[in-house]
Amino acid sequence: MARIAGVDLPRDKRVEIGLTYIYGIGLSRSQEIIAATGVNPDTRVKDLSDADVAALRGEVESNYQVEGDLRRLEAMNIKRLVDIGTYRGRRHRMGLPVRGQRTRTNARTRRGRRQTVAGKKKAPGK
């Protein structure tokens, strides 16, 4: 089992795809890492030698911020925006889109499910 940056890579996937299971590594960054270490991208994770795994682990841990460190960095950046009172910080705090998207309609992912608003009650009939 190849374990890199605290993540168990899926055994039956190609190395190129398996590395993307690490938070902060997408396909292009995965390809950069593989090129730097000289590992064949078509190799399955289960077929990697210990030396290959060690090379990949060394490359990832020395040159990239991934997993917990990256999550902590993102949280600190958002907290800084909130603390200094910027517009972006307020939008983060209110749970609304931060980058200027419209909110009259759409923005459901960021705002959450719709909340039902009670309509007017009819007056009792005579």
Curated annotation (Swiss-Prot):
One of its GO terms (biological process) is translation. GO terms for cellular component: cytosol; small ribosomal subunit. Keywords: Ribonucleoprotein, Ribosomal protein, RNA-binding, rRNA-binding, tRNA-binding. One of its GO terms (molecular function) is structural constituent of ribosome. Residues 92-126 are annotated as: Disordered. It comes from the Bacteria. Pfam families: Ribosomal_S13. Signal peptide: none annotated. Residues 101-126 have a biased composition (Basic residues). Belongs to the universal ribosomal protein uS13 family. Located at the top of the head of the 30S subunit, it contacts several helices of the 16S rRNA. In the 70S ribosome it contacts the 23S rRNA (bridge B1a) and protein L5 of the 50S subunit (bridge B1b), connecting the 2 subunits; these bridges are implicated in subunit movement. Contacts the tRNAs in the A and P-sites. Part of the 30S ribosomal subunit. Forms a loose heterodimer with protein S19. Forms two bridges to the 50S subunit in the 70S ribosome. This is Small ribosomal subunit protein uS13. It comes from Nostoc sp. (strain PCC 7120 / SAG 25.82 / UTEX 2576). The gene is rpsM.
